[in-house]
């Protein structure tokens, strides 16, 4: 489970608040893993999210 990040750790990794991340989970804007009641994230899915939301200049 070392490659899974908690909401708090993932939010810190993305430089956003935990509440923003929970909102994205609720809206299914970001990929996550649910184990019981825990919401977790892989670093790989966070990297993909960052790549998919990167805006490059013209």
Annotated model-derived regions:
Residues 1-20:
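Polyanion-binding surface elements
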Residues 26-27, 51:
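Residue-level detection of the helix-turn-helix DNA-binding "recognition helix"
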Residues 28-29, 45:
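Conserved functional loop/turn residues at catalytic and ligand-binding sites
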Residues 33-39:
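Short Lys/Arg-enriched helix C-cap and helix-to-coil transition segments
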Residues 46-58:
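A short, Lys/Arg-enriched interface patch at domain edges and termini
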């Amino acid at each position: 489970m070392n490659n899974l990040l908690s909401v708090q750790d993932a939010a810190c990794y993305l430089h956003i608040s935990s509440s923003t991340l929970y909102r994205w989970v609720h809206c299914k804007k970001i990929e996550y893993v649910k184990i019981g009641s825990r919401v977790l994230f892989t670093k790989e899915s966070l990297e993909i999210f960052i790549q998919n939301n990167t805006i490059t200049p013209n």
